[in-house]
Structure formats: C-alpha cells, structure tokens
Swiss-Prot record:
GO terms for molecular function: cardiolipin synthase activity. GO terms for biological process: cardiolipin biosynthetic process. Residues 390-413 are annotated as: Disordered. It catalyses: 2 a 1,2-diacyl-sn-glycero-3-phospho-(1'-sn-glycerol) = a cardiolipin + glycerol. Keywords: Cell membrane, Lipid biosynthesis, Lipid metabolism, Membrane, Phospholipid biosynthesis, Phospholipid metabolism, Repeat, Transferase. This is Cardiolipin synthase B. Its EC number is 2.7.8.-. One of its GO terms (cellular component) is plasma membrane. The active site is at H113, K115, D120, H290, K292, D297. InterPro entries: Cardiolipin_synth_ClsB, PLD-like_dom, PLipase_D/transphosphatidylase. Catalyzes the phosphatidyl group transfer from one phosphatidylglycerol molecule to another to form cardiolipin (CL) (diphosphatidylglycerol) and glycerol. It holds the Pfam family PLDc_2.
Length: 413
C-alpha cells in the first residue's frame, strides 16, 4: 500500500449522532460483502443496541463483519451482548485488553483511538464519534459536539487496505510498506482530493502532527481549529503564533464545558501565550466539545480521531483524512463560524490568568507535567499490543431422540 492523494471522491460532513448514526446504520444495512468497524467506545445503550442490531442483521444475511474495540474504552459490554454477535459470525476483537487492578482500568496508555467504518470497499466513515448515546442531543447538557465524514470514491480502497494490513497475521507485510512509504506531496491541489493519514507507534509517530504543522506554515488568510483536547507541544504552539504574527487569522475553538476538568486546566495554561500572540481563542460553552477538525484558507481541511494533546500525538493509534475541496471547506467553515457566533465566548485579556510569579510557576510545572509525562511514557519499553478475539459461545449439547427415549423408559439405546 502506498499513501497518496486520491481524486474524484464524494465527501459529506456529518455532525453529531443525529447525522452520523443513521448514515452508518444505513450503510451497514446495505452491505453485501464486508464490514470493518473500529471504535474506541461502544456502550450498551440505545445507540449501541442499534449498532448491535445492524451488525447482527448483516452477519445473518452472510456479510463478513469484523469489529475492533479498544480494551480500555469499551471494557463493559456484557457477554450476552457480544456472544450474540459472535454466534452469528461477527469477528469480534479487543485491542490490548488488560485485567482490572482493584476495580480500576490500568491500560490507559497506547490506546486504539481510531473511529473507522468501511463498507464493501464502497463507503467509508472516519471521524471522532464513538457509539454511545452521549453523541445525541437528547442526552442532555452533556451531549457531545462532534464531526465525521462519509466518503465514497478511490480513497475508500486506501482505507480498506489500511484496515486489512492491520489485521492479525499481516505484520510482516505491514512493516515492509510502512518502512518505505510516506505521504507524497500534493503538488496540484484540486477538488475532491483526500489523503488518509494515521499515527502509530512504529514508523508513523508524527504524521498527523506533521500535516498540521505544514498547514500552519502554508496558511495565508485563515485557520480554524476545533479540538476537544488541546495541549500540543512547543512546535505547534510556536507555529500558531508565527502564523498569527504574519497576518493569518487564527481561530481556536476549545472546550468551555469540558467533560474532564483537567482539560480546561491544561488549555488555560496556554491562554496568555496564545492570546498575546494574536490567536483568537474561543471557549465552546453549549456542551462538551469532542470534535477534532480544522480548516485552512479555502481548500484544506481535516477530520478524524486525533486530538491535539500528548495522548493522541505521542501514544494512541489515530486516523484522520486530509481534504482538498473548496465545497467541503466552505461547509465546515460555515458550521464552525456558526457555533462561534452562537455558542462560544471569546477569551479576552480580562479572562487571562494574572501574570504573577506564583501563577507562572504553577503554569510552568503543570505544563511540563501534562505535556511531557505521556510523551515520556511513550519512550518506555512497551509490550506488543495484543488483539484478543472473542470466540463464539459454546454450543449446548444436543439432546438426541434416543437420549430422550432412554431417560423416559430407562432402557439403553
């Protein structure tokens, strides 16, 4: 497999579960040959049960279905829930599951964080949505704001090949092409062009971040980044300020109502640096932000699973698509500017932490801990992640008519 820009694709932006889940379930319902689904979280709630029903129906009509769940993100599916799928023929794997220690999950680092669906080499979905009711507006104030894309065209074959190369037993072939192939330069940006990029812990450790940095270097007019967990490294922060100082309008949308308090603490450590450097920072206040999208000028955009924090940039398995398409760029721009106008508060100097020695000391210590601890973990020796396949449930012993007659009469057959 070679990473390259693919032309002639159909690209559709999907916002939140209201748009994403019906599109995915419809595609699964129309699948004829193969379904591959990867996700970090699958809950046994209303949304999870709909996915369960769609996959079960597909398997029962003869479609080959394979599921990869992260062992940390999805630890609590019931045996009955999973066994019903495996009994129907669904190949069900957990990425690097570990036993709990005193009831707590310990396998927090190097997770499989991708969210990908491939249907028959015809349709693919990639983005930030998991399978849980948290992505539906009906969930309430804690419902997540998120994005994905539906793709048709040549890029789907690349995504399918990426998935096939990552199945068990393909490691030798995978290492050969990963060692030699990097994404080539798109020297003639056009329309409906898509590139698959990913992060792993082998030869593609910084591919997604590298595309972001290149985008910031090439930006001429405007960059909008909406990212749920924003805590990048020095190079990224420096590139943001440098772009702002040469006149690029930089809009950064981050969580104002985070699902984890430390997310807000981490982001606010950067406010002085960013705002005083000319970056427009907006806190999204309507509900928790879970999206991972960005755009540049009038043609470049990205959507995927990668946050801009140490876990995504240094440890987790992630996947994004880079898109060159003016129509898609405008659609995403309209959406992001809409939530800025309706649901965001711009961070101004009155909201910045006071520049005291104590605050500066706290910020420096917290920044270095939050930023470097996960990265340091990434350099520690790591075991080879294990893919644990869940086998079909054992079939009950069949009661033959002879056995029944023997029990009823007491006579041996």
């Amino acid at each position: 497999m070679k990473c390259s820009w693919r032309e002639g694709n159909k690209i559709q932006l999907l916002e939140n579960g209201e748009q994403y889940y019906p599109a995915v379930f419809k595609a699964i319902g129309e699948a004829q040959e193969r379904i591959i689904l990867e996700t970090f979280i699958w809950f046994e709630d209303d949304v999870g049960k709909q996915l369960h029903a769609a996959l079960l129906a597909a398997a029962q009509r003869g479609v080959k279905a394979e599921v990869l769940l992260d062992g940390y993100g999805s630890p609590d599916l019931s045996d009955e829930f999973v066994n019903e799928l495996t009994a129907a023929g669904v190949v069900f794997r957990y990425y690097d599951p570990r036993p709990r220690l005193f009831g707590m999950r310990t396998n927090v680092f190097r997770r499989m964080h991708r969210k990908i669906v491939v249907i028959d080499a015809r349709i693919a979905f990639i983005g930030g949505l998991n399978y849980s009711a948290e992505h539906m507006s009906s969930y309430g104030p804690e419902a997540k704001q998120d994005y994905a894309v539906r793709l048709e065209g040549p890029i789907v074959e690349d995504i399918l090949q990426f998935e096939l190369e990552n199945l068990p037993g393909q490691s030798a072939a995978r290492r050969w092409w990963r060692r030699h192939h990097k994404a080539e330069e798109n020297r003639q940006p056009g329309e409906a062009q898509v590139l698959l990029v990913w992060r792993d812990n082998e030869e593609h450790r910084d591919d997604i971040e590298r595309h972001y940095l290149k985008m910031l270097t090439q930006a001429r007019r405007e960059v909008i980044i909406a990212n749920a967990y924003f805590f990048p490294g020095y190079r990224f922060l420096h590139a943001l300020r440098k772009a702002a100082r040469r006149g690029v309008r930089i809009k950064l949308i981050i969580q104002g109502e985070p699902d984890m308090p430390i997310v807000r603490v981490g982001a606010r450590l950067l406010y002085n640096y960013l705002v005083k450097g000319g970056v427009q920072v907006f806190e999204y206040r309507r509900r928790p932000l879970h999206g991972k999208v960005a755009l540049m000028d009038d043609h470049w955009a990205t959507v995927g699973s990668s946050n801009l924090d140490p876990l995504s940039l240094s440890l987790n398995l992630e996947a994004n698509v880079i898109i060159h398409d003016r129509n898609f760029n405008q659609t995403l721009r309209d959406n992001l500017n809409g939530i800025i106008a309706a649901d965001c508060q711009q961070v101004d100097e009155t909201m910045l932490p006071k520049r005291t020695w104590w605050n500066l000391t706290k910020s420096v210590l917290a920044f270095h801990f939050l930023r470097h601890f996960p990265a340091l973990v990434g350099w520690l020796p790591a075991h080879t992640p294990r893919l644990a396949q869940v086998g079909p449930p054992a079939q009950p012993t069949m009661e033959t008519q002879d056995r029944v007659e023997t029990e009823n009469t007491g006579v041996k057959p």
